[in-house]
Design a protein with these regions (language model features):
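A short N-terminal helical cap/helix-turn-helix that marks the beginning
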Residues: 5-31, 50
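Conserved pre-ATP/AMP-binding loop-to-beta segment of ANL
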Residues: 23-26, 151-168, 175
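Conserved AMP-binding/adenylate-forming core of the ANL superfamily
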Residues: 27-63, 71-77, 83-85, 102-107, ...
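Conserved S/T- and glycine-rich ATP-binding loop of Class I adenylate-forming
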Residues: 70, 87, 163, 169-172
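Conserved ATP-dependent adenylate/AMP-binding module captured primarily in the ANL superfamily
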Residues: 84, 99-128, 148-150
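Structured binding elements
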Residues: 91
């Protein structure tokens, strides 16, 4: 019996490896993804990987870099995961947060993550505007991200023993942990 060896999770590296191993595997979307409209309704691992890199370069242009935390607070679509993968390419630490949370809960995240970037869309735009403790220059609307130049930058991997991805649970209190 073969036992799989432990490999650390890196969202970007795992996606890249899949794209290299299976470049022509189709990915079918049931809608145009707001943060990845170039993918249309049908793409492949290879083509989606290329656009993930473009989004990473655009995030870098806006100042996102290794070690930064970035809340991804947008409508529930597959592009949320793709944006987290782009952030991971830069060595930033994505925190994918449910778009159902009110501004007051996002303020708790902002405190706990020490003024992270917040990437948002039209679904969460008004709530982000109501967040009082977030630096405005760290608030990135998806529609503005898409307009940024995409100058290539290298991948940065965090040390394997460092947190590279965050999820949350609200438990019974409604406050993120």
């Amino acid at each position: 019996m073969s036992i799989l060896a432990y490999q650390p999770l890196n969202l970007y590296t795992n996606y890249r490896d899949a794209a290299e191993a299976y470049p022509d595997v189709p990915i079918i979307h049931d809608e145009i993804l707001p943060a990845f409209p170039e993918l249309g309704y049908r793409s492949t691992y290879h083509s989606s990987h290329e656009i993930i890199l473009k989004r990473a370069y655009q995030l870098a242009h806006l100042g996102v870099q290794a070690g930064d935390k970035i809340i991804i607070y947008k409508s529930s679509k597959f592009d949320t995961y793709l944006l987290a993968t782009a952030a991971a390419y830069l060595g930033a630490v994505p925190a994918m947060i449910s778009y159902h949370f009110p501004a007051s809960t996002i303020e708790v995240f902002v405190d706990r993550l020490e003024d992270p970037y917040i990437l948002f869309d039209e679904e969460t735009e008004n709530r982000v505007a109501a967040v009082k403790n977030s630096s405005p220059n760290k608030q990135i609307a998806v529609r503005n991200l898409l307009l940024q130049p995409a100058e290539p930058v290298g991948q940065t991997e965090l040390p394997h023993d460092q947190i590279s991805y965050m999820t949350h649970t609200s438990g019974t209190t409604g406050i993120p942990k």
